[in-house]
Amino acid sequence: MKKWLVVAMLFPVLAVAQQNHKQYEPPSAPGAGQKLLAKFAGNWNLTQTFFPRTGKPIVTTGTCHQYMVQDGKFLESDFTFYRPGGKKTTGTGISGFDPKTNRFTTVWFDSRQTTMSIRQSDGTFDGKTIVLYSTALDPDDPGRKTVARAHLEDNGHVLIYRHSLIGPDGKERLIFEMRLTKK
């Protein structure tokens, strides 16, 4: 009796183990989001304007090299920022789009801090603008609510990225804007 019970319990495990990787996790092809991300690829000069709550905006410059990776499924973005006083910082972003969920997800890390930030869209995509919301990594500390929007202008020669803080009342306050111009 015990033997049959063990066999009955192991059978589903063995059946799942017989699945190959493609059956378990089928590959997905690039979708509409990857088409837009591919338009972001290239070498860019950038101007970043930070809007503090009080005082004058702070303007810095930089460069960005963006390129598609993993057979055209993800956009990698390598930024160099030239801060006031001659200090240079760097940052890297990885952006992807899941055609099944119609969602963009981005991960960002930089030389200024040891944390990573993750943003994700809500599943609506008009084919032109990427809208991302902050995603909390710590369920006990959701952090600030932010929204970031990116779109192309001037026939793809200008990329505008705006990042806003969402207040408790739902109103947005622009924190910074990056204007990237294709080299």
Map each language-model feature to its residues:
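Hydrophobic h-region of N-terminal signal peptides that target proteins for export
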Residues: 9-17
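Positively charged n-region of N-terminal signal peptides that target proteins for export
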Residues: 1-4
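Hydrophobic small-molecule pocket/channel-lining residues, especially in calycin-type beta-barrels
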Residues: 18-183
